[in-house]
Amino acid sequence: TPERQGSLTGKVMQKTVLVTGCSSGIGLESALDLTRQGFRVLAACRKAEDVARMQELGLTGILLDLDDPQSVERAAAEVIALTDNRLYGLFNNAGYGVYGPLNTISRQQMEQQFSANFFGAHQLTMLLLPAMTPHGEGRIVMTSSVMGLIASPGRGAYAASKYALEAWSDALRMELRHSGIQVSLIEPGPIRTRFTDNVNQTQSDKPVENPGIAARFTLGPEAVVEKVRHAFTSDKPKLRYPVTLVTHAVVLLKRLLPARAMDKIIHG
């Protein structure tokens, strides 16, 4: 259970986890599930009205805009104060997609994509690590994507940010190998969430896949929640959690096929 015996006081202390991107979908469902598992959950959202809604759901709301370095600093300071400098877990889940052919995406759009999906997560994690490393235990879980394993036309910006997150997580895992902190990646394929509401499509963007085909392999947020729960509660969390048949297929095909063959499968 997410409780431990205090070494000096004998008190049983509840473990605290920060979850980002809690306004809906994977973040919200995971936050509620981790609460049911016995964790104290700090639920970070970008909008003040969503933070207020977290309070109504029995969660501790935190205002956090990963695109704003000062907001990240304020949120990290609030988390450290609320946890008395003792944080058990961090679920870096927030993010959004900039979709469209690369020749339609400006430098500013690309920077915003990386700011929200990568730089913000890096800054937040580094600010919170001092509240985790002294205690000899902890979990850092990252929401990546099948697009962190394979790129496709029209999704280059999003895929690039997730590829970066994959490499960063691998490096962090090895750097923390003696700390007791475990690092895991969640790699969802098509999931029914409000994520598509946060997609910033360029004006010449066109659908890059047949939605009818994708729909057949789409799962609900609960498929991801199950993996998140395992990553935070298992004695032996996995390094990577592929979610949906699409992700499992991509992992297998990348091992078996040359790059040009993969291009044909993706692009036709």
Residue ranges and their predicted role:
Residues S23-S24:
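Conserved glycine-rich cofactor-binding loop
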Residues N103, I150-G156:
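Active-site loop immediately N-terminal to the catalytic Tyr-X3-Lys motif
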